[in-house]
Amino acid sequence: MGCGEGELARGLATAGYDVVAIDPEAPEGQIFQRTTLEDFDDPEPFDAIVASRSLHHVHDLAAGLDKLVRLLRGPLILNEIAWDRREPMTPEWEEEHEGLHGYGTMRAELDARFEERFFEWRPYPVDGEEVPGLGFRYVGVSRS
């Protein structure tokens, strides 16, 4: 979910995994679909869903996570940003991230639907430097 230019998706496909990679600006190719989570559907559940720096962009987070629960039979693997934890919070940073989900919102919605199996804070690159405690990795399995 949120495959960007598709490096990870291509790597997984080359390693022999069946991959469906979605992004509104996904590249051309058999494994890629230009769509959003909101518009995506598949009749078969996925063994895992990987989302890297994309969950905070989902417009209706609750509905999006409910859809992931329906689409998933294995773990949800996230590499995300807690943009609202940046100190100092510059006006430019706030404006750039306005309308995106912050960490508290994402975490509350995840906890309502998934059981955490792994979590860690990670540095996140901002303006050429690594900002500690701004990125996070999360693995969860559906509570249903």
Describe each PLM feature range.
Residues 58-68:
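A short, conserved alpha-helix within the catalytic core of class I
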Residues 127-144:
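Core SAM-dependent methyltransferase catalytic element
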Residues 5-39:
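Class I SAM-dependent methyltransferase SAM/SAH-binding core
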Residues 2:
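Conserved S-adenosyl-L-methionine
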Residues 77-94:
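Conserved class I S-adenosyl-L-methionine
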Residues 53-54:
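Short catalytic micro-motifs in class I SAM-dependent methyltransferases
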Residues 50:
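A conserved beta-strand element that flanks and buttresses the S-adenosyl-L-methionine
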Residues 99-118:
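Short alpha-helix
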